[in-house]
Amino acid sequence: MGKEMSRRSFLKAGTAAAIGLSMTPGSMFAGVDAKKKKKGVKDGKLKILGVGIGGRGAAVLRGLETEDIIGLCDVDWKYAAPIFERYPNAKKYNDYKVMFAELLDQCDAVVCATADHTHAIICAEAIAAGKHVYCEKPLTHSVYESRLLTKLAAKHKVATQMGNQGASAEGVRQTCNWIWNGEIGEITKVEAFTDRPIWPQGLERPAEEPAVPSTLNWDAFIGPAPMRPYNPIYTPWNFRGWWDFGTGALGDMACHILHPVFKALKLTYPTKIQGSSTLLLSESCPNAQVVKFTFPARDNMPKLAMPEVDVYWYDGGLKPERPAGLPAGVDLNVQGGGVIFYGTKDILVCGCYGAKPYLLSGRKPEVPNLCREVTLSHQQDWVRACKEDPEVRVPSASDFSEAGPFNEMVVMGVVAVRLQGLNQELHWDGEKMEFTNIPADATIRSVIKDGFSIKDGHPTFNKTYTDPVNARQFAAELIKHNYREGWELPAMP
């Protein structure tokens, strides 16, 4: 593999840091020299910059009001107006590049909660400058971007956190502890779902081209994506449903719902993946989709073997079959989704964020705690990590050493859906970030417009397709985007 550190290596390092330092339930910093730990903590408040503050960013910032928020940026000043008013001492911007040019060297940390497609370029610049980073989920828009942020964070030894707040909650810890203690036995199948999307998907590109509002910096919103005319269907909020800007229900919610799966089963790269959906359009994510990930066997734990496992994802109203023994009337949807772990001894069910886990047998076993207990909020756990010396830092609950590889898995599902027209199971080489079984001459196309109509009781099917493109090249662009001119990521460490 050469000089590059593998995803498996990063994951093992992250797991060791997050679990191995805190095996004693009563001590957050077990195994760390107390005097050295105290010396490493910085006094005073963090100076924080916020990018993307009108939506999820507002909630994140409210959890950071113990610190000094010195600069705020949002491309939409109408949407962000209440947040600007809440922090009157922070300088205001509508272009993060301008804010970074003026304030990046003065800050300690950056919060990023912009549209998905700009997460990587904002976070990468901040990390390369040695700044701590909190980034909303999904961490990035592509596999390559996730790998880059993982390696940059390790290189620059900054504290990081992805905004999947369930990672700091009790449900994920309980799920991991039960599974790691062997309570449900070996797991070879997991099914998960969300009730999303709750934003528009399955849309064609709008024909209307209204004027850009004076309060919106459209060029900054587009960022590294290809330029297109403004339409209010894209932003705010609705970016999630458009391929150029978002990752659909899978990207938006799997970072919450699949996190206990990734963590408890110590997943690494999938080796095989396939996706299907309702009508697949070239511009917008489908209304409903199913993805199957296959992961190879992992190293066994003392009380648990880790065989090959299939993980299934459903969204858009689709759900897995109810497990045998689940009482009638019990809703698997808890806080927006659910997960079913099928073990050889029992079945474990939990909700979105890992919430309210239970065993189908009704047992409530008392087991050793092998996870660090997070007594702070998700944001404040990151603040704690920011203020610790890198040599003794206990990683936050969703540090990029774990969140980066995890997000690769999530956006791999998005790629599989977009490649479903190949009509094959896709084989994945995680180290190289490439598919190994797409034929060299394979082509792929997608629907631009669905011209279905009914006249006098007779249906007409008249779809307009994109021109066929080489499937390998198309897949490569989904894995590593070609940014538009003027936008560039740092080199991969």
Regions found by a protein language model. Name each.
Residues 115-116, 120-168, 182:
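Beta-strand-loop-alpha-helix segment that lines the small-molecule cofactor/substrate pocket
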Residues 38-39, 65-66, 70-73, 79-80, ...:
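Glycine-enriched catalytic-core subsegment of oxygenase/oxidase enzymes
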Residues 1-18:
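N-terminal secretory signal peptides and thylakoid transit peptides that target proteins
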